[in-house]
Every structure is written in structure tokens, then in C-alpha cells.
Amino acid sequence: MFLLYEYDIFWAFLIISSAIPVLAFFISGVLSPIRKGPEKLSSYESGIEPIGDAWLQFRIRYYMFALVFVVFDVETVFLYPWAMSFDVLGVSAFIEAFIFVLILILGLVYAWRKGALEWS
């Protein structure tokens, strides 16, 4: 039989953890001073008055470099559980991990040939 009282602690935790950020935003909105002047609305960079437009276009290479880094960084996290249980898993797990690393290397070679790893 499904008993709801077993989940009381879950619901209490869910309500409290949802109420704390809402209350924090509400209290900061009520207590914060609202003074909008030219000093407040200007952009500030190292104490120097900015010159020109704030909207600059960046080259796509910076984003591609970051994306390739994140992809390979996240993929290496998947190798950690395999490495911790390598002696228990056997030869089939070794072959699967070898194929996984081979796919990563092929992706790295592809990104390298396309120029996604060049900074300038």
C-alpha cells in the first residue's frame, strides 16, 4: 500500500528549499534602495569611463575552442568509473573503453583539422 506519510520529510524539504530563494529575492527587493541616476546607469570598467559601444562581436573560434574543451573534459569524466572497476569488469569493458577513447581521439583529430583548436 502506498503511504503518503512516508514522504512528509521530502515535501517539507521541497517546500523549505523552494521558499528560501523566493524569500531572499523578495526581501532584497523590498529592502534595497532604488536610486537610478547617471552614475548608476553608466557602465564601469576599472574606474575608467568607457569609450565606444559595449556590444562587441567576438570571433566564433573562441566559442569553438571552449566547446571542444568542455566536450573532452566531460567525456573524460566517464572514464573514471571504468578505471576504478577495471579489474572486476574484464576484457569486454576494456574493449568498450578502448573504442570510447578511439572515438574521442578521432573527434580531437577532426577538431584539429578543422582549425577549432587554433587560438588566433
Swiss-Prot record:
Principal place of residence: plastid
Q: Name one GO cellular component term.
A: chloroplast thylakoid membrane
On the tree of life, the source organism's domain of life is Eukaryota
Identify the keywords attached in UniProt to this record, alphabetized.
Chloroplast, Membrane, NAD, NADP, Plastid, Plastoquinone, Quinone, Thylakoid, Translocase, Transmembrane, Transmembrane helix, Transport
- Residue ranges annotated as transmembrane are 9-29, 64-84, 88-108
| This protein's record includes keyword Transmembrane helix | yes
For this UniProt entry, the molecular function terms from Gene Ontology, in alphabetical order, are: NADH dehydrogenase (ubiquinone) activity; quinone binding
- Where in the cell is the protein located? Plastid, Chloroplast thylakoid membrane
Gene3D superfamilies for the chain:
NADH:ubiquinone/plastoquinone oxidoreductase, chain 3 (1.20.58.1610)
Belongs to which family?
Belongs to the complex I subunit 3 family.
What is the protein name stated in its UniProt record?
NAD(P)H-quinone oxidoreductase subunit 3, chloroplastic
